[in-house]
Structure formats: C-alpha cells, structure tokens
Amino acid sequence: MNSLWPVSVSHTQLTSINHQVYVHPTPSSKDNIPGFLALAKPRGATTDKEILVAWIPESKLQESAADFESYVKVDIKESGTPASSSLNLAETLVSPPPSSSFSSYAFSIPISDIFSLQVKQPSLGWWWGSITIHTRSKEDQLPPLYFHDAESQSTIMEQKRRNKKFETFDSESGSSMFWGGDHFIQVLSKYANLERAESDHSFLLVNPREGDAERFGTNLTGGSEEPSQLVAGIPGRGAGGDPVDRGAQVQKAFSDIRWGLLSNLAKVTQLTRKVSQGVWDSSPQPVKQLLMKPEVKKIGDDFDSARIYLAKWALSVAEESQRAKLKVLFDDELRELVSDEGFELIDAENNPQRRNEVSLAEWNAFFDYNGRLIVTVNEVKERIFHGGLAPAVRPEGWLFLLGVYPWDSTAAERKELVSKLRVDYNRLKKEWWVQEDKERDDFWRDQLSRIEKDVHRTDRNITFFAECDAKKDGDDDNYDKDEFGFSSQINSNIHLIQLRDMLITYNQHNKNLGYVQGMSDLLSPLYVVLQDDTLAFWAFSAFMERMERNYLRDQSGMRNQLLCLDHLVQFMLPSLYKHLEKTESTNLFFFFRMLLVWFKRELLWDDVLRLWEVLWTDYLSSQFVLFVCLAILDKHKDVMIDHLAGFDEILKYMNELSMTIDLDELLVRAELLFYRFRRTVELIDRKNEDRRNSADGSEPVSITEDLRELLSRKVIVVREGERPEGVMGG
C-alpha cells in the first residue's frame, strides 16, 4: 500500500484520535471539511512537548489506505466497543502528519509551540462545540475545529456509556453534556499543563510561562487542577465560569500578547460569526435531512433536553442562508386557491423592505415655516413604520405619535400646549405631595411600596438610571428613608426620583387603575428619550390609554389578546397550532410578558425604541404587535414542531430567544404575514359571497370578529372599572 509520505520519513505513533472534527471554510455547510484531530508521538521523541497536535482531512488520509485504516482503528479503540478490545495502540504507526497545507487546511504542531486553546462548548444556540489552537507565533493562524459529535462513533459510544452509568454530564458542575472537546482536553492534559485564563475562561493556556499567565491575568497553580475542573471553568460549564470585576487586572489582561493574539484571531472568527446568520425558511431541506440522521435522532431519544438543543441548533444552521430572501409564506392549499383567484403571491422578489430612519432634516421638511404639517399624517406614519425615527427626531416625533401633540397644530400652538401641560402636571403632583400622612390610606401606602420596589430595579443598566451612590443593590436596609418612606438609594439619582414621582402622579391621575407592575418598564424609555418629566408623564398617560387593557385587575385584556392570537395562529399557522394543542401550549403563555410590556425584556434597548414607534403608527393595524408575535412563531415553527415535545420545552425555547431577535427581519416577516392575512380574509369574503349567490347550499367560512378587528387601525381602549373597597393594587 502506498503511504501518504515518503517511507524514509520516520513514522509517528497515534496516541489519541477525534474523528468527525470539521473545518468550516465558508458559512455554507456544503463546504465543511471532515477530518481527524490527532495526538501523535514522533519516533524518537523524548519529552511530551514533542508530541504533535494534528488535524488531517479525511480526503488527504484516504490517499493512503494504510494510514486511513490506522486512524479509524484508533478511533474505534477509543469508542470502547467490544470490537476495540483487541486493538493495540502501541502498534499503530502512521506517516507523520503535514506541518501545514494551505489547500487542505491540514496542520500539525508540537505541544511546545501551542500558546493556548480557545474552547467553545456546544450551547443552546450553537450545535457544534469548537476548539481553536493559538500558536506562540503571531503569524500562524489555525482554523477553528468543529466537533460534529452526532457523527463521531467514539463520542456517541462514550455518551451512551455515561448515560447507562447516570454520568451524562462531564464536568463537576453537572451542567453540560459530554462532547468531543472534553475528550481532547482530557487526553491533552496528560501531556501538557493546562491552565484556565482568569480574565477569559474560554481560554486554556498550554504549559504557560510566568509572563503568559501575567498577561492573561492568570495565577499559576502548578497543574493542580483536574481536567474536569479545567473544562468546568469554561463558560456555561458551571463554577468559575462567570467573570468577576477585576478593575485594573482586566485592563492588564487585555494588553501585550492578548491584544496581539485577539488581533490575529479576528480573521479566523469572522467565519464563526457568518455561519449563525440567515433565516430558517431559506434552506430548510438540508437541515431537516441532517436532523433525520439516525445518530442525531438517537441523541434526542436518549436525552429529553436534547430536543431543545437540536431545535436551537437547527435554527442556527438554517440561518446560513441570506436573511432578506424570505420564502413564500402561503401553504400549498392556500397557494393554489390564491393562484386560482389571480392574486400575486408574496414572494422573495417583492418583499417589503426596511428603510433608513427619518433624519432630523427629513422630519423638518414635513412642516412649513409655521410648524404645521404639509404632508398627510398617513405619509408620515408610513415613513416611520418602515424606517423608524433618528434619535434627534424622537423627542418631538413621539409626542405626535402618542397624541400629545395634535397633527394639525402649529409650533406656537404646541408651545402653548406644553405650558398648559406643565400646570396640569404640577397640579396632579401637588395633590399627593401635600397630603398629610394620616390622609394616606392602606391602598396609597401599598402603591408607594410597589412603585419604590419597581423603580429601584428598572433599567439600572442604563447610564441614565445608574447608581450614583457608593452602596450597591441589596443594601436597602442601610439607607435612610425620606418623608414618603422611600430609601435614599432612589434619592441618589435625580432621574429615579423623577421616575418615582411620575408613577405616583399617574397613580393619583388614574385612581381606578392605579399603579400595576410593569408600568415602570413603559415609562422608562419615554423619560429617557424626552428627558422632561412633564412631557414624559403625559406621553405615558397617552400610551397607557391603549395599554390599560394589559393591566386590568381581572386580566381580561391580556386574555382577549392571547385569545385573538390563538385564533390568528389557527388561521395562519394551522400545522403549528395542531402541535401546540398536542403539547398543551395553546395558552400561548410565553407571549404574556412580550405583550404586557411590548417586548421590553426581549429586545435590546435601541430595538425597543424602534419597535414602539413602529407600533404607535397603527399604519396597518392598531394591533400589529400580534403580527409581531405571529412572526416569531412563523420563524420558529419548523423547529418547534420537529423537536419540542412539551410545554416546558416550548416555554424554555421561547424564553431563550430574549436578546437574540433580529428586529428588522422580524418586522419584514410581520408585515408579510399581515398582507397574507388581509388577502386571505378578502378571498374568503369573496368565496362566501359566491356561495350565497349559488344554489349548492355550502356553508360560508366564518371569520371571528376579533380577527376582523385586526384589520382596523382604530386603537382599542378599555378602562378599568371602579376599584372595590379594600382591593389593593396590582
């Protein structure tokens, strides 16, 4: 048999193999290259530092049948199958792996030349764990190595062995399933001292020198840690995974070698970022085929939690395709029906597009020299709906959108209006400010307690509301109380005081509703944008006119919205709805918080501002927020149907979408769904009219009133009834 390298070259002894370790050269999965990650000891080597860490693609090894057979033999040996017991690793000699190969990505490097390993274990948002090897030479850049464990016989067998012994999780933390990277690290730790970097626990320093440790902010421990402890310190692995505040130490950790290293890493990690982008709909078939592989299905059969794992992974793979090219949203039956009627399908060629935000110059051009609008209100709303407002426009634009400023007013009239609003706000504020303590009943005291509690924890990550006092959260008992019973912790920040006072004033202004938990989340962005307590208060009052139904004591407003969303899912996504019925998830509880505070906890701060101004336009529907919810379900319906088998799993999956949502893509999808909904209603109405005029006696298709109401742009206002005696706030 021909050997891969000349016979004259000394052979190496394989000591460990990880098969199905891939290089991902491009974002496309079809370009992935499978290979072997090996530890090989050159003949004549006298120290462990001479052992080679190598990655060789399968295609390269297959040029030598003998070498390929040897690599497979070692992988089988490490799988622990009965057939592997007779294999002798000491006899497994192969040709030395290539030091580097630009065309095939193959490499080998002695342990002495390795500076660190960057370890990223499999997570709920990323199926493959990866290890990137960083050398001591800044010029050498090696590709990340992705462990496709569902295809690796040795990893699958080890997972099964652990499962039988109830040792499913690898680390002492007991928080993560065993994966191929664990095996590689454990074997490597037999030949090298691996030290976790304190400043970034995803890095393991290899045989670190004193200078390396200092630059990485790591204290040398002399190799006292067990391999499982090393792995446990990687993010997501349990104890030690969370960084702590080290001040100057962190600054030092990112200097010198680390900066050079991360700079060189930039080109390599770009590949990783690209792979996670795209839309599930644009390439579902390859993903589904991969998920149907027996090895992948077995993981789901062995571990209930793996269904969530696989669902997240399936979405991340599917998002390799370009985001903007959404597929046709109609199902086959509706597509045929619509085509028969001659409607144009909503497809990838005529998708609505997000536009640039409305700049201050463009906004000013909407008004004449008197400050009166010279374009139609609908034109302004359309522009905001598709692009949003620039930060400089929001303070004025939001007051128009919320109805504080009339659209037909002049600048002078608005100035006069603001003066009146200041008088009214101060009057309302004075009503509770001058009250004697004996005049404050239990309800009032209860409301103040609720307000203080919520204000204290509202958006404290925003600089505007950040702590000014030296004391930290949790020290409430150490703060003095003011005349209203509020701690001086709130009084340490003027903006927290204003937030508190506005909520107390609203409690006085709307006595039937009062203050209900969640309102502080609605007021906070208004105050940050307007930075005027009077204007923020009246903007909040206007906002609450449409949001009051979310906070009714009997929760009928939230129930009605969720029921309408239930009908909408049945109407638009019937296959998903059937699955939600099977999993007892038709209560759509996972949307409760999203509707209550309009995605305030699910989106990044800037995205919250953009979403709210889009929803305030009522451009397509006053309940467009329900189509935003529908768009989330539409995006994730395939993975939910295929891989989430219970209410708990669906709830967990939906909750973990927080801070991962692409708002622009979501709004485009929601708009497409609205158009599809509207056209379908029109089509059904036409069909019903034809049936009424025909003699066949067929029953018309009914559409519920709440669904028809989704086509209305009129804001739904529901007021709280009079508060019964003795009933506290919410």
UniProtKB/Swiss-Prot annotation:
GO cellular component term, pick one: cytoplasm
Sorted UniProt keywords: GTPase activation
PROSITE patterns reported for this sequence: TBC_RABGAP
Gene3D superfamilies (UniProt xref): putative rabgap domain of human tbc1 domain family member 14 like domains, Ypt/Rab-GAP domain of gyp1p, domain 3
GO molecular function, one term: GTPase activator activity
Residues annotated as domain Rab-GAP TBC: 434-619
UniProt xrefs under SMART domains: TBC (SM00164)
Summary of the function given for this chain in its UniProt record: Most effectively accelerate the intrinsic GTPase activity of YPT7. It is also active, but to a lesser extent, on YPT31, YPT32 and YPT1. YPT6 and SEC4.
Name used for this protein in its record: GTPase-activating protein GYP7
Organism the protein comes from: Yarrowia lipolytica (strain CLIB 122 / E 150) (Yeast)
